[in-house]
UniProtKB/Swiss-Prot annotation:
InterPro entries: Pyrokinin_CS. The modification Leucine amide is found at L17. It is found in: Secreted. It comes from the Eukaryota. Keywords: Amidation, Neuropeptide, Secreted. This is Pyrokinin-5. PROSITE patterns: PYROKININ. One of its GO terms (molecular function) is neuropeptide hormone activity. It comes from Loboptera decipiens (Field cockroach).
Length: 17
């Protein structure tokens, strides 16, 4: 969704680089 390397349910997950 915003940042991270993947997305799930419109939410970000992973390193926000």
């Amino acid at each position: 969704g915003s940042g991270g390397s993947g997305e799930a349910n419109g939410m970000w997950f992973g390193p926000r680089l």
